[in-house]
Amino acid sequence: MSNQRDPRYDILFEPVKIGPVTAPNRFYQVPHCNGMGRMFPDSMIEMRGMKAEGGWGIVTTEQCDFHPTGDVQPFTETSMWDDGDLPYLAAMVDAVHEHGSLAGIELVHNGQDSGCLYSREVPIGPEHRPVTWHQHPIQARAMSLDDIRDYRRWHRKAVLRARQAGFDMVVVYAGHNGTVPSHFLSRQSNQRSDEYGGSLENRLRLYRELIEETRDAIGDTMAVVARFAVDEMMGKDGLEWAGEGKEAIEMLAELPDMWDVNVSDWDNDSMTSRFAREGYQEEYISFVKSVTSKPVSAVGRYTSPDTMVSAIRRGVVDIIGAARPSIADPFLPNKIKQGRSEDIRECIGCNICAAWNNLSAPSRCTQNPTMGEEWRKRWHPEKIAAKESDSTILIVGAGPAGLEAALGLGKRGYQVTLAEARNEAGGRVTRESRLPKLNEWARVRDYRLGQIQRMPHVEIYLESEMNAEQIREFGADKVALATGALWRNDGVGRNIRFPVPGCMALTPDDIMDGKRPATAGSAVTIYDDDHYYMASVIAELLASEGYRVTLATQGMCVASWAEYTLEQHHIENRLLNAGIQILARHQLTEVGEGWLQLTNTLTGEVSNHEGSVVSVTARLPRDELF
């Protein structure tokens, strides 16, 4: 393992001047929600400090709402409604400064998106319209000119409080179609006829005023960052990067100290790896550097230092922005700096981090189990307590749980033996990563195997199925069983509590093992009571092989839980484009030879369908050894 940085990466560690402040390198942890915020401030503070310890030159808050009319309950964000919020925000600044990084704050008012469920204030926005989040039966009122002046005053007060808390940078946010400035900018939400509506110049007026007034309030004591979505991804119905998006940047080009550019809305900006590759936003934002002299940052789930360097050298960005990669590996910058790129814990793009935030819970990460537990459990992504004994340990099963256990115990110094029945490690991760567009999920396996293979005291044995007697004979002091689970084939799941008559369906395990419905090109119904990704990827696979696929689910839509991972509508669009029929609110009630019966859960109407069944419902643990 090299301890010398590849000189190709030196450019990533050059300081960057951003107005009156200087970032120590080109790594910018952009604002990202995390489900901690004001409800769990100690957890939030420790998590942000960990990013700074790991080498991120700029570390920012999540969105920080600055007035009760922008209350975002039930989401857990930071807030700056009054001076009472200063202590925990100042503590975050101290945690970031301790490691020499710049601390930034993103001031946000969600306007017509937020229902003000806690504050009970009337939401505000450019127009009279219902609030958008959760379809609450709450109406936002159109802002008068006096309201706009009040809003600007509230924002200025928040900027001054941010300076009082010690922040180095303030982010003025007009992105994700989720803030008052972005609502004024969008033709979809602003059809005013006064000086704040109509032309692009008018719709951009409020954002210009906020940037100018932020600069006036803080002078040269803090940097001003414009976080701006250049494309609403609506085609000609919205802002487009080659049209008004570019014109807006040109109008404001030299006003901020830095541009942080992206696309709207959040589920386009943070697309999963199933739908977007690393650096996918470059086609939308690459023009920005040509129209401003100020530093430009953008995101794109960058995990490869080669891709980062390329983006800088090609003149796409000056600063690498990242949210999810900084969650998966808070020490990504330091690993590159120390010549340890092979140790990077690469983001797999599953968006479980976003899901937990959307569930109003502290974020977690598939790759980084310490995320969200830096304070409560004192977990550190790179440090772990040394072993407490000389016990030998046998782990049965080299799936993701077995690999993680072996890695953690190996780091502690234990002698570990890992036995796997199959001819390859990784378990479900290996198998699922071969399904359509899930290849990056294999990073869960690859990172752990890469670390373990450099540990002489951790041994892996493949094709080594063990029974209880063999485990006893092995003689390890401690045994951990990580033998996983198998999908049920009888239809039992969340909504069906007893086996479906006649159901001996194929399962995802069968499909991943190469089994198929008997006749190529025949009809197959995938019954989904899991409501996440699996049924849809099985549907994609079988449709690509020529089967006539129907996806039936008791949910109100396909892959309903994927709303939390920001990909439900992407999934549904892909299935429809593949010619897959979707039947929502349908329950599997009987299966026969070459046919199945579905019942509409609202009307009770029964329909018979030809073909075979794939059941994606629930799993049972492989507990033979317990």
Where in this protein do the model-derived segments appear?
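Rossmann-like dinucleotide-binding cores of NAD(P)H-dependent redox enzymes
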Residues: 415-454, 530-586
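Short acidic loop-to-helix transition motifs that present clustered carboxylates
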Residues: 303-306, 327, 465-468, 511-514, ...
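Rossmann-like dinucleotide/flavin-binding elements
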Residues: 387-418, 461-472, 483-498, 502-563, ...
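A conserved short coil-to-beta-strand element within the FAD-binding core of flavoproteins
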Residues: 461-474, 584-595
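A short helix-to-beta-strand connector/capping loop
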Residues: 316, 452-460, 498-504, 575-581
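Hydrophobic, well-ordered secondary-structure elements that form the walls
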Residues: 259, 288, 311, 323, ...
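Flavin-dependent oxidoreductase catalytic cores
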Residues: 1-396, 400, 404-416, 424, ...
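Conserved acidic residues
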Residues: 57, 168, 257, 318, ...
